[in-house]
């Protein structure tokens, strides 16, 4: 299920665009996640009270968390699948503390793809979308394996 060097290059090329505005991208990803899958909002005590898109857009906490999420994901993507050291603490916190099911990681992966398609259409064609989907699936599969090791049924 690994990615070729060419696929990793496509992933990292578009990720460079994300890094030019991590707070903006992170905010958009979380807003899309919460709009498309409102049940995910229940896992975020800081954001549960945000009901409208306008409230979400004006939330500094949401923007900060989006930055945290995409910064962590960027660090993992740059490892090109050799992300064990980065993944272990992330899996631990998401399993034991936050109780985030793997399904929600699928939902945020979808949100990431949709945001990249809307913001970077010219740099995120079918090949790049396919490569990013594979990279995010690899990440989710590895998180799921860690969850299993930790005894979390998410």
Swiss-Prot record:
In this UniProt entry, which cysteines form S-S bonds?
A: none
User: Lineage, please?
Assistant: Eukaryota, Metazoa, Chordata, Craniata, Vertebrata
Entry's Gene Ontology cellular component terms: extracellular exosome; sarcoplasm
Binding annotation for nitrite: 65
Residue positions, PTM Phosphothreonine: 68
Q: What does this protein do?
A: Monomeric heme protein which primary function is to store oxygen and facilitate its diffusion within muscle tissues. Reversibly binds oxygen through a pentacoordinated heme iron and enables its timely and efficient release as needed during periods of heightened demand. Depending on the oxidative conditions of tissues and cells, and in addition to its ability to bind oxygen, it also has a nitrite reductase activity whereby it regulates the production of bioactive nitric oxide.
Which positions are annotated as binding O2?
65
Q: Which gene encodes it?
A: MB
State the organism named in the record: Erinaceus europaeus (Western European hedgehog)
Q: Which keywords accompany this UniProt record?
A: Cytoplasm, Heme, Iron, Metal-binding, Muscle protein, Oxidoreductase, Oxygen transport, Phosphoprotein, Transport
Globin domain spans which residues? 2-148
Q: Which reaction does it catalyse?
A: Fe(III)-heme b-[protein] + nitric oxide + H2O = Fe(II)-heme b-[protein] + nitrite + 2 H(+); H2O2 + AH2 = A + 2 H2O
- Record-linked InterPro entries: Globin, Globin-like_sf, Myoglobin
Q: Which domain of life is it from?
A: Eukaryota
**Protein localization:** Cytoplasm, Sarcoplasm
Its protein name is Myoglobin
Tell me which family the UniProt entry assigns to this protein. Belongs to the globin family.
